[in-house]
């Protein structure tokens, strides 16, 4: 019997000598300020469609190719198999992704997304687009190069309306298939709004709503207000 572990880890790895870049990235993307530790447990990724809990792995290295050599060893297979995604913060002109990705992606789980977040200010979007075109069909995994420039914010979409920069990374995570994870639909999230309002408070709210309803002269506005209050109070009954 093969155990199916939840693929609920996202690794953020940086080879940049300045740690503030990784810190800023984690805050911007995950609203995470716990950058002094290597594992941040039970984070929440939530959008209008679903909510899921994941663990955030944070690491640094001097050279990503050296790190990859260790990551693709058989000993690291259990770790690779629980990775929802891996985000590499790097200078893509120094990393040379053509040499890096082939060995890396052969070992990575087929459902793991990989994002290379470029921090080289001289790299233009055209160069990023060329790399994405080359690697778009190389593997079944989502592999994407993204420009992320702290000193000059990246434009968040191109002429075709496609998202860029941090917005594109958010989109990749939003559309990720969270393998073996408990993904909570947005409708269920709404149902879990606390319904333990005291009875006295419910009565006071009804009385206040009745007074306001009687003060509204326009019948359409009054009906709209009544419906709104009915929906609001129904969550606590």
From Swiss-Prot:
Signal peptide: none annotated. Disruption phenotype: Displays increased levels of spontaneous RAD52 foci in proliferating diploid cells. The keyword Magnesium does not apply. It comes from the Eukaryota. One of its GO terms (molecular function) is protein-macromolecule adaptor activity. Gene3D superfamilies: 3.40.50.11960. Keywords: Chromosomal rearrangement. The keyword Heme does not apply. Involved in gross chromosomal rearrangements (GCRs) and telomere healing. Belongs to the IRC6 family. This is Increased recombination centers protein 6. It comes from Saccharomyces cerevisiae (strain ATCC 204508 / S288c) (Baker's yeast).
């Amino acid at each position: 019997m093969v155990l199916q572990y939840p693929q609920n880890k996202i690794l953020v790895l940086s080879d940049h000598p300045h740690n503030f870049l990784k810190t800023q990235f984690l805050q911007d993307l995950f609203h995470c300020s716990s950058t002094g530790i290597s594992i941040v447990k039970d984070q929440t990724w939530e959008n209008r469609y679903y909510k899921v809990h994941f663990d955030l792995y944070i690491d640094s290295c001097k050279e990503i190719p050296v790190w990859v050599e260790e990551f693709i060893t058989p000993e690291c297979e259990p770790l690779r198999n629980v990775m929802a995604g891996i985000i590499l913060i790097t200078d893509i002109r120094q990393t040379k992704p053509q040499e890096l990705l082939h060995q890396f992606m052969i070992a990575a789980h087929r459902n793991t997304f990989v994002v290379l977040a470029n921090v080289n200010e001289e790299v233009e979007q055209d160069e990023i687009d060329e790399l994405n075109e080359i690697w778009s069909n190389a593997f079944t995994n989502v592999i994407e190069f993204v420009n992320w420039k702290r000193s000059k914010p990246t434009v968040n979409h191109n002429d075709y309306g496609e998202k860029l920069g941090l917005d594109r990374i958010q989109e990749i995570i939003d559309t990720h298939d969270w393998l073996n994870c408990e993904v909570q639909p947005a409708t269920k999230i709404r149902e879990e709004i606390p319904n333990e309002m005291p009875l006295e408070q419910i009565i006071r709210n009804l009385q206040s709503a009745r007074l306001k309803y009687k003060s509204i002269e326009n019948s359409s506005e009054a009906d709209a207000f009544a419906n709104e209050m009915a929906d609001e109070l129904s969550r606590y009954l």
